Amino acid sequence: MKVKMKTKRGAAKRFKKTANGFKRKQAFKRHILTKKSPKRIRQLRGTKLVHVADVAAVRRMCPYI
């Protein structure tokens, strides 16, 4: 019997698989927002796709999602 790979639980909570790749939330939006401009805070809204260079690492961390 082959041993299953473990999923990195922290990564599984941070990334979701979509048809176009892996979806992630924007960083730098939790605290110390007073010194950031409204434009910058507005642009940090929503989700982005994981960069092509990082997709392989996310796949290794989350083999079953």
Swiss-Prot record:
Report the sequence similarity comment from the record. Answer: Belongs to the bacterial ribosomal protein bL35 family.
Q: Which cysteines are joined by disulfide bonds?
A: none
From the Swiss-Prot or TrEMBL record, give the protein name. Large ribosomal subunit protein bL35
Gene Ontology cellular-component terms for this entry are: cytosolic large ribosomal subunit
Q: HAMAP family from the entry?
A: Ribosomal_bL35 (MF_00514)
Q: Which UniProt keywords apply?
A: Ribonucleoprotein, Ribosomal protein
Q: Which InterPro entries match?
A: Ribosomal_bL35, Ribosomal_bL35-like, Ribosomal_bL35_CS, Ribosomal_bL35_sf
Molecular-function GO term, any one: structural constituent of ribosome
UniProt key word Ribonucleoprotein: yes
Asked if the record carries the keyword Ribosomal protein, the reply is yes
